């Protein structure tokens, strides 16, 4: 598994554990897990500061920190966990990304079908709403295995249409107070509509790991059902033709099967971000190897050898091959590293396997065939 994907999955695990404890009123355990998630996300920011998702990681860190402060107010001095601190009312200003995402469609290698689907659903209606008398999709679900660029594609859309970008997750909505979580959902959507109306700019509400917030689970309480119902109500409100708000909801998930059918119907576009095919792998390899010195590397052969690898995996393979020759330079006390050759890639592929199991891909394919909506 690639380092970035591994860290993202670790942060996600801690965040899910934090939200679970949060829902159960266990503030101390929630704080512990939010802090662990922050530590991992901070590592991601440090390692991938120049990456297109660094700003999103930082946004998540800030949201988890805010949630920790709220939870601390709920813990009395004796640590019993039943304090009467302030309610968890979401501040939408804190969820709006202050800086425009740096990534655009040109930065995304491959995924042409995905980009075209998003242009049809969001870019064209935003630029020429007069050409869409029947309206256009307001809900877009992007799904697929980790490491295939779901978060990056959402950020790129926001850049393409110069929109406000509101990032939402379970931590920003959660509350132990009865009725507060659904009020938070309503507040997010109301603020998005007000922003769009005031400035005439589109607004994207991006919900990462949407299954954690709105998926169906065996052990859930009435509050989670109410949040889902409120969300469905707000999604229906976006379709009101009497109000031409340019507000879109993009949900991203690695587990689309956690979402029930009434919820899926609100997402008129359901876009599967697959593992890269051979042409996309070739494009990815050309893109990443353009930054390093190479000698006698057959990109076509390498593209065949990397079948089953994610885009993130391929980046890590190129990085590992380059690190291999740098290590050799230090070991042999040379002045400069030699060029990376085909043998370097073959050696790396012996010790780096795809981060996504082929059996899991079959599950994605089966779900896609049943629910696809491009």
From Swiss-Prot:
Q: List, alphabetically, the Pfam families matched.
A: AAA, AAA_lid_3, MIT
Keywords from the named record: ATP-binding, Cell cycle, Cell division, Cytoplasm, Nucleotide-binding
Q: Which residues bind ATP?
A: 144-151
Quick check: keyword Zinc in the entry? Answer: no
Name the cystine pairs.
Answer: none
Expression induction? Induced around the genome segregation and cell division stages. Down-regulated after UV irradiation, indicating division inhibition in response to DNA damage. Expression is highest in dividing cells.
Q: Where in the cell is it found?
A: Cytoplasm, Nucleoid
MIT domain location is 11-73
Q: Main subcellular localization, coarse class?
A: cytoplasm
Instruction: Please name the Gene3D superfamilies in this protein's record.
Output: 1.10.8.60, P-loop containing nucleotide triphosphate hydrolases, Phosphotransferase system, lactose/cellobiose-type IIA subunit
Listed GO MF terms: ATP binding; ATP hydrolysis activity
> Which GO biological process entries does UniProt record here?
cell division
Q: Which cellular component, as a GO term, is one annotated location? A: nucleoid
Q: Which family does it belong to?
A: Belongs to the AAA ATPase family.
Assembly information from the UniProt record:
Interacts with CdvB.
The protein's role, per its UniProt record: Part of a cell division machinery. The CdvA, CdvB and CdvC proteins polymerize between segregating nucleoids and persist throughout cell division, forming a successively smaller structure during constriction.
Comment block on domains: The MIT domain is involved in interaction with CdvB.
Q: Supply the name of the protein.
A: Cell division protein C
Species this protein is from: Sulfolobus acidocaldarius (strain ATCC 33909 / DSM 639 / JCM 8929 / NBRC 15157 / NCIMB 11770)
Q: From the UniProt record, report the name of the gene that encodes this protein.
A: cdvC
């Amino acid at each position: 598994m690639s380092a970035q994907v591994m860290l993202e999955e670790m942060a996600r695990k801690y965040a899910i554990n934090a939200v679970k404890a949060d829902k159960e009123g266990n503030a101390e355990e929630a704080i512990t897990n939010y802090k662990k998630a922050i530590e991992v996300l901070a590592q991601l920011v440090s390692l991938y500061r120049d990456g297109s998702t660094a700003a999103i990681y930082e946004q998540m860190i800030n949201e988890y920190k805010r949630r920790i402060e709220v939870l601390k107010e709920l813990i009395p001095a004796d640590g019993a966990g039943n304090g009467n601190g302030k309610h968890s009312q979401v501040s939408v200003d804190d969820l709006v990304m202050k800086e425009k995402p740096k990534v655009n469609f040109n930065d995304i290698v491959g995924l042409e079908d995905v980009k075209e689907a998003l242009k049809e659903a969001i870019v064209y209606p935003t630029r020429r709403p007069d050409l869409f008398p029947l309206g256009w999709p307001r809900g877009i679900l992007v799904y697929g295995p980790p490491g295939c660029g779901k978060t990056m594609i959402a950020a790129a859309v926001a850049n393409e249409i110069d929109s406000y970008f509101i990032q939402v997750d379970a931590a920003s909505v959660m509350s132990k107070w009865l009725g507060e979580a659904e009020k938070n959902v309503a507040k997010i959507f109301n603020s998005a509509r007000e922003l769009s109306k005031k400035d005439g700019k589109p607004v994207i509400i991006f919900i990462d790991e949407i299954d954690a917030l709105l998926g169906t689970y065996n052990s859930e309480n009435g509050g989670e059902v109410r949040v889902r119902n409120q969300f469905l109500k707000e999604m229906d409100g976006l379709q009101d033709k009497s109000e031409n708000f340019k507000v879109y909801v993009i949900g991203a998930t690695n587990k689309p099967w956690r979402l029930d059918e009434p919820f899926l119907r609100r997402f008129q576009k359901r876009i599967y971000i697959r593992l890269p095919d051979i042409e996309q792998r070739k494009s990815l390899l050309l893109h990443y190897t353009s930054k390093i010195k190479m000698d006698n590397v057959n990109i076509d052969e390498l593209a065949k050898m990397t079948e089953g690898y994610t885009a993130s995996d391929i980046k890590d393979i190129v990085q590992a091959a380059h690190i291999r020759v740098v290590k050799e330079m230090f070991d042999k006390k040379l002045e400069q590293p030699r060029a990376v050759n085909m043998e370097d890639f073959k050696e790396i592929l012996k010790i780096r396997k795809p981060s996504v199991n082929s059996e899991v891909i079959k599950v994605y394919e089966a779900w896609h065939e049943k629910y696809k909506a491009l």
